[in-house]
């Protein structure tokens, strides 16, 4: 059963990949939590469109995309 826009298996794979490729699991967990907190406040401020994806799920997807495709980052 899928209750959000993210497949649970895909989310688990992305999370495992983030942890596996990190040198420090704690800092990776903190980065995910910080990004989720930012997204949560963006949702409250109306900066993001309505989404069924929870902030933690969105943070994991964003961070794994940044890790897998660093050429997409500005700068």
Curated annotation (Swiss-Prot):
Disulfide bonds: none annotated. It comes from Prochlorococcus marinus (strain MIT 9313). The gene is rpoZ. Belongs to the RNA polymerase subunit omega family. Promotes RNA polymerase assembly. Latches the N- and C-terminal regions of the beta' subunit thereby facilitating its interaction with the beta and alpha subunits. In cyanobacteria the RNAP catalytic core is composed of 2 alpha, 1 beta, 1 beta', 1 gamma and 1 omega subunit. When a sigma factor is associated with the core the holoenzyme is formed, which can initiate transcription. It comes from the Bacteria. One of its GO terms (molecular function) is DNA-directed RNA polymerase activity. It holds the Pfam family RNA_pol_Rpb6. This is DNA-directed RNA polymerase subunit omega. GO terms for biological process: DNA-templated transcription. GO terms for cellular component: DNA-directed RNA polymerase complex. The lineage of its organism: Bacteria, Bacillati, Cyanobacteriota, Cyanophyceae, Synechococcales. The keyword Nucleotidyltransferase applies. Its EC number is 2.7.7.6. It catalyses: RNA(n) + a ribonucleoside 5'-triphosphate = RNA(n+1) + diphosphate.
């Amino acid at each position: 059963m899928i209750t959000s826009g993210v497949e649970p298996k895909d989310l688990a794979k992305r999370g495992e990949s983030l942890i596996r490729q990190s040198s420090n699991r704690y800092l990776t967990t903190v980065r995910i939590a910080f990004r989720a907190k930012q997204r949560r406040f963006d949702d409250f401020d109306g900066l993001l469109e309505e989404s069924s994806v929870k902030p933690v799920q969105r943070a994991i997807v964003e961070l794994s995309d940044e890790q897998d495709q660093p050429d997409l980052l500005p700068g």
